[in-house]
Curated annotation (Swiss-Prot):
Belongs to the IPP transferase family. It comes from Limosilactobacillus reuteri (strain DSM 20016) (Lactobacillus reuteri). Catalyzes the transfer of a dimethylallyl group onto the adenine at position 37 in tRNAs that read codons beginning with uridine, leading to the formation of N6-(dimethylallyl)adenosine (i(6)A). Monomer. This is tRNA dimethylallyltransferase. Its EC number is 2.5.1.75. Residues 34-37 are annotated as: Interaction with substrate tRNA. GO terms for biological process: tRNA modification.
Length: 307
């Protein structure tokens, strides 16, 4: 059984920097657990780690998809499991860094997601619920899931229509509750390090980071994606991109678009915190207000590795 560290928490809390520090300390390699950093050419809006930040630390599952490709939790699990085994075979420590909670859960709970390939039945089910969502709204679709599987609906925000539809797909295809999907026996031993901080501190960091993204060229990056038909592409759904599309169409001002990015980022951070705080085995630290906690984290990992 491989030992794996996962650094979790909301956006802008310092996961990338900590993952690199720990990789240096424990001879580790980093696996991105972010659903948007897989896309090539989308660097600024995804807060992708830079080559300068990486230094000599190997990073995986970054820049592996074109913008028109669909990247799913099933595909992530398959690739991440492969990388974990490869890294462990090199006698290095796999370190997962990222904020996509369900992606991490596929690994920690070893979820049986099945094939990543679409079939016609899946597409038909998905398109049906998409049409229902467009006609009656996201809350109505969530209520249908709530009637069928209250446990699953309690874990999925009403606003996350994509995951709600995914749950309805699974129920329809398998005849089983989404919350009762089978788990395989755990193959890896995970240590979850959670990063958090006071909400005003976090929100201020998010707002400043969005401003810095704009300064660093987010507008140009998003415009390129828009010109590639980004509104209809999987990569175009990401925060930092879809909020700018109405601006490019001349429907809102740049200030309004930027404020929407900040708002969506703050809401996303809140959802991330809620998700990870429900993981009872996460060990929480606030290295933004208490930088010396990094030493405590290192000692904590040292003790865990010896077990």
């Amino acid at each position: 059984m491989n030992k794996v560290i996962a650094i979790v928490g909301p956006t802008a809390v310092g996961k990338t920097a900590l993952s690199i520090k720990l990789a240096h300390e424990f001879d580790g390699e980093v696996i991105s657990g972010d659903s948007m950093q897989v896309y090539r050419r989308l660097d600024i809006g995804t807060a992708k780690v830079t080559p300068e930040e990486m230094g000599d630390v190997p990073h995986h599952l970054i820049d592996i998809c074109n913008i028109e490709e669909r990247f799913s939790a099933a595909r992530f699990k398959k690739l991440a499991d492969q990388k974990i085994d490869e890294i462990a075979q090199r006698n290095h420590l796999p370190i997962i860094a990222g904020g996509t909670g369900f992606y991490l859960q596929t690994l920690t709970d070893n979820l049986a997601l099945g094939s990543d390939q679409f079939d016609q039945q899946t597409l038909d089910i998905r398109n049906h619920w998409k049409e229902v969502a467009e006609e009656k709204g996201a809350e109505y679709v969530w209520e249908q899931l709530n009637k069928l599987d209250p446990v699953a609906s309690a874990r999925i925000p009403k606003s996350n229509t994509r995951r709600v539809i995914r749950a309805l797909e699974v129920i329809k295809k398998t005849g089983q509750l989404f919350s009762n999907q089978p788990h395989f026996k755990a193959t890896n031993d995970f240590l979850l390090i959670g990063l958090t901080t006071d909400r005003p501190v976090l929100y201020d960091r998010i707002n400043k980071r969005v401003d810095l993204m704009i300064q660093n060229g987010l507008l140009e990056e998003a415009k390129w994606l828009f010109d590639q038909g980004g509104e209809d592409l999987p990569a175009g759904k990401g925060i930092g991109y879809h909020e700018l599309f109405p601006y490019f169409r001349g429907e809102i001002s740049l200030d309004e678009a930027v404020e929407k990015i900040k708002q969506d980022s703050r809401h996303y951070a809140k959802r991330q915190l809620t998700w990870f705080r429900n993981k009872a085995d996460t060990h929480w630290f606030d290295i933004l207000r208490h930088p010396d906690d990094i030493n405590q984290i290192k000692q904590f990992i040292n003790d865990w590795l010896k077990k």
